[in-house]
Structure formats: C-alpha cells, structure tokens
C-alpha cells in the first residue's frame, strides 16, 4: 500500500497537470447544468503583482482591486514612515518594486499551526502575502494585503494585541510612487515627475516653495539636481526676480513648504534660519510642532482619536534669541488653538496629517464582502452539498480563520481540523491557470459541452474529391506527377496542366474518387510537383489526428492564369488551358473550401495567417483535415498487458496516448495566456467526454449474468448498457470508462457480420442452384413428358430447402454470437479482469446474438427475403395442386 503522505493531492499540482486532473476527475462528477457561483469566478491577486503586470488583474474584480490599491497606498505610507511597524518587505521606486532581503517585523505571536504549503503557482507578492498570512496574525496580513472591511456585513472582527491606524479613502498614492518618469535624485521619497520632458508644474511650484528655505550655498546644487532653470524657462518664471523668502513664523503666508522641507530635504540641504516675531528659533522640533499645529489645526482631534497618548496643549513654549543674542522664551497661546507635540517623530506625523487631510476631502471606499478575506461562516460551508464541496476544494485554496489566545490566525482548513481547532470562517482563493480562474474555466467548459451537440470541425467539401479522370487516367496522372523533376514554378505549373489535358483528351469512364487515406499524399504530390511551397503540420486535438497543409502562394484561378502567361502563353491560350483542365483547377482551388478555421480559436496556432513579400495574394492556401484516432492508437496497450497486480492496473492510464496529447494542448493553451473553456472542450479526448460514473463488479465473472444485465434499445445504441456490463465485471479494480471502446467493438462486430452475410449469400446461391436444377427437372417431366410428379415429392423438396436455409441462418447466428462474445471478452481482458473460469453456454450464445441483432437486422432481413424469393420461385414453377400445404416461415 502507498503511504498516505506520499499521495499527490490537487493542491500540490500546477499548470497543465493540475488542469488535466481537474478536467478528468472533477468535471465528470458535475452536472452539465451546474452553476458556478459568480463570487468564485474571480480571485485575489496582490496589487503589487498587478501594478507590475497588468494582465494579472484580469482575474480580479476591478472594484475590489481599485479599493485594495487605494488602501495599500495608505498602509504603505504609514508603514514606511513609522519607526516600529516595518511590515512591508518591499521598497517602491519609480516603475519598480524592490524586495528587501532583511527580515520583516513579524510578531512573536506566530501561528501555532505550522504551514507546509508553498503556493509556487501564485505571483510573487501574492505568494509572500499568503506565507505571512499563514505564519503571522490575520490582522497583520490584512494590513499588508490592503484589506477593507465591508459595511453592514457579517464579516469577522479579527482579534489582535495591537492595531494600526485604519484610514479608508480614494487615492492614487501607489500610482504616484511608482510613476516611472521622474528625476533621478538622491532623495527617493520626493519624486519629481517629468511630463512631456519637463518637470511637472505642481512639483515645480512645490520645489520653488522649498527652495526659498535652502541656504544660498546649497541652492545651486538643489537647482542642478531638479533642473530648476529649465523648468523655470518652460513656465516663464524668472528665478532672479522671485520675492525674498518669508522666514518669520508670525507672518508666513503658509507653512506647507517649510513642512515639506522638514519631511524630505532636511538631511540633504541646509535650511536658512527661522524666526518668531523677529527672534531666531533655536530648536527644529519646536518649529515643526508650531508649523504642524497651525497648518493642521482642524485635524488634531482626529489625530487624538488614533493616538490618545499624544501630548496636546493650549500653548507652546518657543526658545529663541533676540537680535542682541539674548535668550528669550516665548509662550504662545492663541484662542481656540491647540498645539501638538509630535515627539520628534516628524516624518511619520507629517505624513499622517497629510493622510488625514486627504481623507477629509475624499470619499470613503465602499466594498462588498471578499471571499478571500471575509469568506463564509463555517456552518454555511459545512451545509453545502457534496458536489459544491468537491468543486470548491478542488478549484480553490481553502483557508480557515480561528482564534487562539485572543488572537485571530489563518491556516489551511484541513490543517485547522487536523490540529483539532474550531474554524470560525472559511476563506477561499480560486486558483488561476493560463490567465483565468479554474472556476471560470470549468464554468465555460460546462457551458461549451452543454451547448454543442456534435464536435464540429472544418472539413473538405466532399463533393469535390476527384479531378475528372477515370481510375486508369488518374493512376497515369499520379505516376506522371511522381516523375516530375525540379523545375521553375511557372514551368512546372504549365507542364502539369498540359500533361493533365493530354490524359483527359483520351480518358473515358466515370471520375475516380480519391480515397480518404491517400488524399493528403495526393495533395502534397500535386502542389509540390507544380513548384508550390507545401508544408505539413500534424498534431492531436481531442481524439482526432489534425493535419494542416499550407500551400504558398495562395491558389486561385487568377494566379494560375497569370503564372501560365509568364511561360510565353498568351491570355487566350492560358484561358483555353484553364478550360480544358477545369476539373483539375476546380479541385485545386477548392481544397480549402471548409468553414472558416479562424472561427475556431484553438486551431489558430496550427493555422496561422502568413504574409509573404512578393506573393501576389499575400497569403497561402490552408487545408485542414481531421481524422479519428483508431482505438488501438488511443489506448496504452503496452501498459495494459504489462500490469499483473491490482495496484499496477489501477496505476495504468488506459488512454495514456491521447491524455498525453491533451496535456500538451493544455500546456500550449496555458502558455498563450488566453485559455478558454471552449479550448478545453475542443481539446478534450473522448475518454473524458464520454466518462460516466460506474461501480466495481463482483468477485467473479459470469457471461450469462453480464448478458442478462443488457437490455435492447429501440435506437440500437448499446454503448451505455454494454459499458455497465463491462464495468460490472471489473472486480475491485478502478472503474474505467469504456464507452468508445465498446462502441468501436460493436461496430467491428457489425462490419464482420456484413462480410459473413456476404459469404452466406454466396453459399446459399450455390446451394439454391441445386434446388433450382431439381425444380427444372420436375418442370420438364411434367411439361414435356406429361408425367405427373406427386405433391408429396414437391413438398419434400421445398421442405429440404427450408431446412437448408434454417441451418445456414443458425450457423450465421452462432458465428455472429461468438464474434460478439469475443469482442466483449477482449474488452474485459483489457480491463484487467480474469475470465479463465468463465463458461459459455448455448443460452449465452442466444443472448449474445440478441444483443447484436439490432445492428445487423437489415442484413438478416435481406437474407430472409432472398431465401423467400427462391422458395416462392421454385414453388411457382412446381405447380403444386395444394399450394398452401407448404409455406416459407421466417423470424
């Protein structure tokens, strides 16, 4: 037995292998009318991943994404300016997000349930967020994930020892921080944006405002760093005529630019002296406390809501020196004015006041409940039916929220249950493959299967499968094409057309239709001998061999005429050749007459549109052909016959060849980044499409019991019943899908029956000739010699003919019954079930014949009518006195 820990589960698989398992194991268990919840059709992707790669945002809800980007911008500014948080392990620069290798500030309150999942299929920042969420507290994960609590919902209030400021409003902070075209300056926090090659007007005005507080010695370096002179010329500003800076706090028109200097430039440039009522200020902290208090006076109560311990007073003491350099302490107290002491944490509180100011003039973000963050109540999850539960657990990462020591944590739901914890809510993260959520792909695939009744594919016009030559003429033309040497394109076309016309003139007989198996070879030989560039590509799509033949340049009547004229043919002569070779040219220009293959998305990679310089039409002729794969090529015969144990049988993928091709097609679709459910459906092999849920059979095999389980159907479609019979004989091995296998087996028996009825007809005709000669002799005796042959002699002869036909039909039935049993036993043997001890009785033969009879009923009726015709003909010629004494009775 395989150890339980070594079993590969769906959450350990990725890309095509994962999608294949979903399609082959989960999809067959869903009803075709199964409705996927709209909330599960989108997923969560960390905004950092989307900002670096816009295509990743296609699987998210746009309103949730915009809300998360706004919230994340606020949280990032709070975190990067704080002295104690430092939860983000990234640095946002112009056009890039750099990962910090130093450990982030994860709390000591780590998750007691150890996470063993890596989530390698997720984008890097989403993967990192999940690792943090399953390691640290849920509250911290929500902070660095941009979570916004929905209003009026049953979302959970997570528990945490310490909580951070929660601000919520529309903003473009992240976009501004990541704006690519900025001046490369030593100060990374202030990003001077370049618009149309010039410093933006807003940044220019702010820099001019800051510039007035920079000392004269540092001002040239400042101007050079930010190209102030160029921007001033562009905006028509004369730097030499700027007004002198106002450096007195009592008369400053605004404190904005002095605060900006403190926020961004204090450590790079020297500041001019600042005064209060003519006295020089001595301490920078007092300058900032005064400026911030005056500029953000209305926001101080809001600040206290977040930081109740911050000192707030009705006055402020400023330490200054008067013009005589004497120390003067000034106590400033203004009516209805409060002064806040930011405790020398200038950078954080300046940033936080700016956030509060932005919040005051912006609208709050409204979001709905998130399946990733808020999820659903655990009781609601448990109440879902088995089908929903199976679908969710196979297409989503399933997490659970639980409380431990007054702290909320998140872990894989199965890990929580294994740890004997009680989940409170269940959160879902739908997986993404090829740029789409798996849940959405399954929904599209189910819709495609439900809406398409037949597997359509572009096919050739079957009415044009000849070139107007008889079989003899076609073979001569075919041999001539094989002898054509390499010649210039124009010359080769002319010689082939003229050779065809020559053969056509003396050809007699009905047109020979090209066989399907030789069609592609003839196409290749015909166009290659004419000098066209012919390329062939072959692949497998579904359970069909796909052949793509491209012919360049494109074949049209006008192109042939133009080419013939290049070989010294006049236009009139070229038209005559075209007329004489009408059937050939009609065949050539009609080879690609099928439904537009470009409407089938999944075949575009096989049939790309090309454009070649020098080609009159600018494209080529495409021939697309599809042929079903034979059953022996579809199944893994080597794997089946090499399996000797039950485990080996269970591990054998019977349809390995076509499943491998299916995986390759899935990989190609995923790599394209534009996979759809229709792609999956059209690439799906028959063994998955036709799969039904079956149960294993009993421990022994009884031919009679198997045949008793089969019922006759009016439509002669025995596939489902025989599939049930076969699956009932598989003992304890894994249930396998035999729909297509049984269907082909029955068709094989039916074809064999046609051949057998032909042999029987020939034998019957030869034997009937003896009876005919006997009847002729009786006729001669009575007509010529006027002797009378008794009715008992005539009746005896007719009875013997009836016995002959009955014996012939009985032999035919036994033969067909044996053929049918042989086909079914062959399938059972392939399925891994032992049939050595099975005994076949006469009753089994009768049952076997009854099963196949609906498929060969027309042939049986034909034979009976033929025999009846002989019987009635002989009876008429015998001229019996009592004609009703003998009659021909059939089934």
Curated annotation (Swiss-Prot):
- One Pfam annotation reads Pox_P4A
The record places propeptide residues at 615-697
Q: Which organism is it from?
A: Vaccinia virus (strain Copenhagen) (VACV)
Assembly notes = Interacts with P39/A4.
Originating gene: OPG136
Report the protein's function: Core protein 4a is the most abundant virion protein. Major component of the virion core that undergoes proteolytic processing during the immature virion (IV) to mature virion (MV) transition.
Record note on modification: The precursor is cleaved by OPG083 to give rise to the 62 kDa mature protein during virion maturation. Proteolytic cleavage of major core proteins OPG136, OPG129, and OPG098, which occurs at a late stage of core formation, is required for production of infectious mature virions (MV).
Homology family: Belongs to the orthopxvirus protein OPG136 family.
What is this protein called in UniProt? Answer: Major core protein OPG136 precursor
Q: Site: Cleavage. Where?
A: 614-615, 697-698
Which superkingdom is the protein from?
Viruses
Q: Which GO terms describe its molecular function?
A: structural molecule activity
Give Gene Ontology CC terms: virion component
Please provide the record's keywords in A-Z order: Virion
